[in-house]
């Protein structure tokens, strides 16, 4: 198990480059098996989830080559293979293989997905979408078995109860080779969905309306990759570095961003008093002065992203007065980081799943646990702010979502080391 050791209290400065979007990458890799020709993805982040997805592809005889930020995937010799629950349970995004396998083979056998522990994240909308396309779905021995009818999947009108990113992406992948037209109503509008649609359209799919709440897909016979696909920048990684820069930065420029993907987040940070200059594809975050508390409410895109409520929390602690409020309307139970911040001296608490933050003059180093990716990012920022040494256990969770994090932090001047905990078997050593 990984530990991140931070000797904090040092102002950081310099430049940082944002990697490709994790939430695109973890869908694009499974979607690659829909192609009958080799796929090239560029701008791929070096994160643990990518390595885990490559392992799952290996189970299906799909060859992968990952060099620097380019991932080559060759599915030409793919075989239909059940994906075991053991490997699936470490990776929530493995559920995208349901839609991808169903679209490619007309059948998917996938163990129940795992990933971050942030409360209930049911996949009932995914299942209802597959059933609307004509598939049968059953649960057996901790596996989901999805089977298309003998004459294949048929297009359908599917109305999502809520705009789920995962369900929208899975239905797109299953329906691109279905017969006829599929319409997804109340679809999620996240930039990562546009990225997936662009990738599939460049392989011959016919998808219109991605980025709106109604997506139309005309089924085609097969897909063939023709050109490399460059993944969009990671808006969550970018937002995390904005928070870090405002908390402990002495002037940091963040490169490779799409500002409009961060509109809701940047508006809230600037409401606090953080000064940011935006160029065409970069942001410069000035050293923060006196900041004021704000209220944060997460929402589906284009609202404030749930994945950024934890990274902004340390910034609230730097305000000079008042009470900051964080309400996560997407995952109300995403509060595990609060007890860990309290170990570091943070004046923060939870009441009825609402986070209440108060000015905290100084954090101190402590041993804390990164229960999931974004909680880990929150604690990482807090550790960089704190006096003394902070040890973050389960730091492998941070590596699941943040590209080359140790290297990037050191380039900004941070004293950070990631190592294996000698008391726990090491995993993900190749990240």
Curated annotation (Swiss-Prot):
Pathway of action? Cell wall biogenesis; peptidoglycan biosynthesis
CDD domains reported in the protein's UniProt record: UdpNAET
Keywords attached to this Swiss-Prot or TrEMBL record, sorted alphabetically, are:
Cell cycle, Cell division, Cell shape, Cell wall biogenesis/degradation, Cytoplasm, Peptidoglycan synthesis, Transferase
Catalysed reaction, written as an equation: phosphoenolpyruvate + UDP-N-acetyl-alpha-D-glucosamine = UDP-N-acetyl-3-O-(1-carboxyvinyl)-alpha-D-glucosamine + phosphate
Keyword Transport set for record: no
Q: What positions does the entry give for UDP-N-acetyl-alpha-D-glucosamine binding?
A: 92, 121-125, 307, 330
Pfam families reported in the protein's UniProt record: EPSP_synthase (PF00275)
The Gene Ontology terms for molecular function here are: UDP-N-acetylglucosamine 1-carboxyvinyltransferase activity
Q: What class of enzyme is it?
A: transferase
E.C. number? 2.5.1.7
Q: Which GO terms describe its biological process?
A: cell division; cell wall organization; peptidoglycan biosynthetic process; regulation of cell shape; UDP-N-acetylgalactosamine biosynthetic process
Kindly identify the residues recorded as the active site: 116 (proton donor)
- Gene Ontology CC: cytoplasm
Cross-referenced InterPro entries: Enolpyruvate_Tfrase_dom, Enolpyruvate_Tfrase_sf, MurA_subfamily, RNA3'P_cycl/enolpyr_Trfase_a/b, UDP_GlcNAc_COvinyl_MurA
- Positions the record marks as coiled coil are none
Tell me the residue numbers annotated for binding phosphoenolpyruvate.
22-23
NCBIfam families attached to this UniProt entry: murA, PRK09369.1, PRK12830.1
- Name the job this protein performs: Cell wall formation. Adds enolpyruvyl to UDP-N-acetylglucosamine.
Q: Which family does it belong to?
A: Belongs to the EPSP synthase family. MurA subfamily.
Q: What is this protein called?
A: UDP-N-acetylglucosamine 1-carboxyvinyltransferase
Organism expressing this protein natively: Lactobacillus acidophilus (strain ATCC 700396 / NCK56 / N2 / NCFM)
Gene coding for it: murA
């Amino acid at each position: 198990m990984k530990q991140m050791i931070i000797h904090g209290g040092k102002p950081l400065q310099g430049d940082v480059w944002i990697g490709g979007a994790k939430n695109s990458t973890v869908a694009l890799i499974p979607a690659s098996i829909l192609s009958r020709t080799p796929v090239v993805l560029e701008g791929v982040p070096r994160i643990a989830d990518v390595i885990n997805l490559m392992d799952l592809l290996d189970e299906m005889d799909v060859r992968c080559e990952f060099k620097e930020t380019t991932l080559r995937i060759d599915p030409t010799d793919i075989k239909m293979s059940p994906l075991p629950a053991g490997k699936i349970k470490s990776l929530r995004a493995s559920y995208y293989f349901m839609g991808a396998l169903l679209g490619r083979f007309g059948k998917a056998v996938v163990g129940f997905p795992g990933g971050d522990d942030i409360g209930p994240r049911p996949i009932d909308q995914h299942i209802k979408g597959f059933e609307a396309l004509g598939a049968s779905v059953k649960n057996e021995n901790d596996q989901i078995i999805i089977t298309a009818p003998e004459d294949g999947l048929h297009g359908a009108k599917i109305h999502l109860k809520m705009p789920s990113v995962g369900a929208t992406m899975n239905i797109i992948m299953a329906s691109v080779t279905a017969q006829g037209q599929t319409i997804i109503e109340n679809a999620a509008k996240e930039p990562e969905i546009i990225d997936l649609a662009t990738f599939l359209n460049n392989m011959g799919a016919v998808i219109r309306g991605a980025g709106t709440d109604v997506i139309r897909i005309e089924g085609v016979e097969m897909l063939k990759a023709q050109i490399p696909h460059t993944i969009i920048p990671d808006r969550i990684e970018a937002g995390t570095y904005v928070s870090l820069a405002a908390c402990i930065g002495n002037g940091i420029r963040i490169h490779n961003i799409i500002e409009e993907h961060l509109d809701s987040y940047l508006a809230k940070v600037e409401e606090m008093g953080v000064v940011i200059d935006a160029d065409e594809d970069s942001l410069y975050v000035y050293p923060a002065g006196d900041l004021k508390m704000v209220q944060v409410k997460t929402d589906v895109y284009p609202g404030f992203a749930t994945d950024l409520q934890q990274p902004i929390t340390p910034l609230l602690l730097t305000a000079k007065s008042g009470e900051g409020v964080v309400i996560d309307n997407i995952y109300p139970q995403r509060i595990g980081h609060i007890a860990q911040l309290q170990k570091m001296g943070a004046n923060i608490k939870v009441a009825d799943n609402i986070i209440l933050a108060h000015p905290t003059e100084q954090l101190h180093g402590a041993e804390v646990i990164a229960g999931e990716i974004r909680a880990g990012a929150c604690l990482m920022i807090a550790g960089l702010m704190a006096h003394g040494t902070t040890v973050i256990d389960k730091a492998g969770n941070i590596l699941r979502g943040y590209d080359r994090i140790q290297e990037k932090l050191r380039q900004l001047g941070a004293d950070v080391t990631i190592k294996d905990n000698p008391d726990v078997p090491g995993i993900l050593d190749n990240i």
